[in-house]
Amino acid sequence: MTFFKKTLLILSLGIVSLAAAQKVDTKAKNILDETSANYKSKSTMYFKFVYGMGSNGKVSKNQTGIFYASKNKYKLKIMGNEQIFDGSKVYNINAEDMEVTIAKPNGSEAMLSPINYLDSYKKDYNISYTGNKNKLEVIKLTPTKKNGIKHVFLHINKAKKQIEKIEQYADNNDVTTISISQYKENLKVDSSTFSFNKNLYKNYLITEL
């Protein structure tokens, strides 16, 4: 489900540790390393966010979503759809179509985990510090190879070591954004949050790939 991939791609950019082989701005690297260490130290994380999308560099549509994560497991809910990764399989649940698709994660799906996805930036992106905007430090990520993305801007609260906003601009001038409206950490989250209960979807078409 491409929508979920794009959403998590930009949702979790704060958890990153970059390697010296890239063109790395020292100030940007230090900010990202501190943010990375902060997120990785948490047992669980909860984000409520506004996902924006549009074209020609302007956001024209917004949707609210929530995201739970515990180490390499997560649950995403947005637009009446749900995606669960239990550490082994990815479950895509489409309420409107009453369909569930179950699959082993491929390379891109495995990287949907906040930590695992962002570790890909070790080899795929150059980073630079662009300044302070609205009291947030802004880091620019530019892909080292063509991947459809022109650049990504991370807006980071340096004091809290947290991402507050992410802007992704594509080569075709499409724009997607994530604005974090609520963040909680180390919550007591029931383990069932990250598991798929087949009994709850008896009337759904369930396909395992």
Predicted regions and their residues:
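N-terminal leader/targeting segments and the immediate start of mature chains
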Residues: 2, 18-59, 72, 146, ...
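An acidic-aromatic
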Residues: 64-111, 171, 176
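Beta-turn initiation residues at beta-strand->coil junctions
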Residues: 51-53, 95-96, 167-170
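Bacterial N-terminal signal peptides that target proteins for export
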Residues: 1-8
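Flexible, surface-exposed loop/linker segments and immediately adjacent secondary-structure boundaries
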Residues: 105-134
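Gly/Pro-enriched, hydrophobic low-complexity segments
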Residues: 134-209
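Bacterial N-terminal signal peptides
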Residues: 9-16
